[in-house]
Amino acid sequence: AFVSTDLQVNKPLRMKKLREYHEVLIGGSRYIELKGRKISLEELSTYPWISLTSEALTRKFLNNYFADHGLQFLPDMELATTDLILPAVRHNLGIGFVPEEFAEEEKKAENVFEIEVEEKLPTRNIILIYDTEYPQSIASKEFQKFLSSQKN
């Protein structure tokens, strides 16, 4: 399995960190007043948020991030997959975190912009969890090669 959050695993399972990635907070034209300045999470918590459903590991990560700063994360819109967040932000339904690579093209096209947050969001990892008692599939090995070849 490939996950984006460190988990506790017991033998015969093992974890292997494959790649780091960063998430960025993005907004659409409706929130242009947020562009070009550092903004606290407390101030940002007053804006409409778009995130994943509460069961998602990324959502739990964001819940903890907000809690670590004395805030509760209460998104106004919950979506099933990360790739749905970007179009929702582009259509000005709120602000949201996405992996940096997801936002690159839309930022270049100026459909969305990055919002600089005072409280730094920790770097995340793509992690492979595998069973040492079974051989890894060809697909798993190829995906690992692909991730290793990508820039950090």
Residue ranges and their predicted role:
Residues 1-47, 54, 121:
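Acidic, Gly/Pro-rich loop/turn segments at junctions of secondary structure
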Residues 2, 115-152:
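A late-sequence structural motif
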Residues 8-9, 31, 58, 84, ...:
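Alpha-helix capping/helix-boundary segments
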Residues 17, 24-26, 30, 95, ...:
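Residues embedded in well-ordered beta-strands
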Residues 33-35, 48-69, 136-140, 144:
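Secondary-structure junction motif
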Residues 61-115:
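Hydrophobic hinge/microswitch elements
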